[in-house]
Structure formats: structure tokens, C-alpha cells
From Swiss-Prot:
Pfam families reported in the protein's UniProt record: ABC_tran (PF00005)
Binding-site residues for ATP, renumbered to this chain: 40-47
UniProt KW Chaperone keyword: no
A GO term from the CC aspect: ATP-binding cassette (ABC) transporter complex
UniProt-recorded name of the protein: Energy-coupling factor transporter ATP-binding protein EcfA2
Record's subunit section: Forms a stable energy-coupling factor (ECF) transporter complex composed of 2 membrane-embedded substrate-binding proteins (S component), 2 ATP-binding proteins (A component) and 2 transmembrane proteins (T component).
Top-level taxon of origin: Bacteria
Amino acid sequence: MGINLQEVSYTYQAGTPFEGRALFNVSLEIKDGSFTAFIGHTGSGKSTIMQLLNGLNTPTEGTVLVDDVAIRSDSKNKDIKNIRKKVGLVFQFPESQLFDETVLKDVAFGPQNFGISKEEAEKLAREKLAMVGISEELFEKNPFELSGGQMRRVAIAGILAMEPSILVLDEPTAGLDPKGRRELMTLFKELHQGGMTIVLVTHLMDDVSNYADWVYVLEKGRIVLSGSPKSVFQEIEFLESKQLGVPKITQFAAHLRERGITFDALPITLEEFVEAIKNG
């Protein structure tokens, strides 16, 4: 199951004095089984696209196709609800959405909301909590008694319990320490390897180079560049003009190139850099 945006535009608060255009005639494809990243400066339209992918918002113009189900400005709630089960959306700081009295109940709420029995929902909740690294001794605790990193994992388990085939992540590691960030990104990598389509919004270019297989660059509601991370991160000057960076190792290699060391293409991961130096 993939997602296609066909000439999609989105206007906030249309028809009011506060009207603002967030997307302009955007067309793109998120392929089934891909790990697609979106990068762009604040206000570029990344989060707006994320909210369109699972029907949280509907396009002002154009069509969002999810597994051949169309979301348009006049789409009915029934169609959108089915899409929200297929496309799980993890907001930035998702722990702010926790609400129930125990960890287990919180994670089981989503599946029950889609008509799954309490028994089956709790079974799913246990499975997904284990998947994100939450031990059974925490299942009956109030989620607000957990650490920030644990709360983040519980919130993500709640999305996974609805068994989406596409997982949309809006800055999922924001505010976490390096260890917590690595652990979460490893989880998303494992989900992707298991067949799940992953969509990632991030400002961390090293995460794009290490995990994504396709990247879209947005500016002021338009796609200005797209391609494999390898090809996109060769465009250092262009990205800098958009107030965006490149992976640390790519920047380092670019400095070496200025000093006379040649590369067939700038490496975007440490492994590529080591290989290039060995073969240099």
C-alpha cells in the first residue's frame, strides 16, 4: 500500500482574515515498503503533509490516494476513519496524548475504538508494548509516572496497536537524549525491515542518510528537490540556500575535497566514508 498526492493544495482557515496557504499544487509518491523522509525549514509544509496522509486534514484542492482510497475536500468521515487505521500518525511529543489510568489501558484504547474486543485489544497492547521495550511490570502503572522516554514509547505502542501498514513520524525523537534517539530509530528501522512503510519528518540529516531510501525537500509549501539521500546530499550549496544542512560526515568530506582529496561522490554515512578512503 502506497500513498500518492495529486496536485494537492491546502489552505488554513480558508475564507477568514487569517487564511494562509500551506501547500501549493504538491504531487508526490510514497512507495509501498519505502522509508521516505521529508526535510525543510520551519513553515515549509512538512507537518501539513503529514496530517493529510492519514486524513487528519483533507486537501483544499487535489487528491490524496491511500491504497486507492481517495481523500478529497468533500470526503466522508467513514472513508477517512478507515484510512486512519491504515496510516498511523505519531506526532512530535506524542506522550502529550496519553490519558488513561494505566499503560495497558492507554495502549488498548485505540484498537477498541476501531471495534476490536477488549480481550484482543489488550493482547495487541501487550505485544506492542513489548516491541517498544516496555516491561510487563509497568503495564499497570499510570503512564504519567514513567520517564519521558518511556512515555514516548507507550504513545508509539498505542499507534502500533492499531496495526497500521504505514507509520508517519513527525520529529519522533525530539527532546530525547542520544541513547533514546538511537533506540527509537533502531525500532523504526526494524519495523521497516518487517515490511512497514515509514514516513519520517526530521531536521536530523544523519537520520535521513542512515535510514531513508528517498527524501523530499520542501520550501514554502512546494517540493524543491527529491531523490535518494545520496543524490540529494550532493547538493550542499542548494541545501544551504534553503537553510538546511547535510550529514556530518558529508560536511567533513566536503571540507576534505576543498583541500584536494577527491571523492567520486560525497559519502553520506561513516561506512561510505571509510570505504571511500580505503579505495582512494
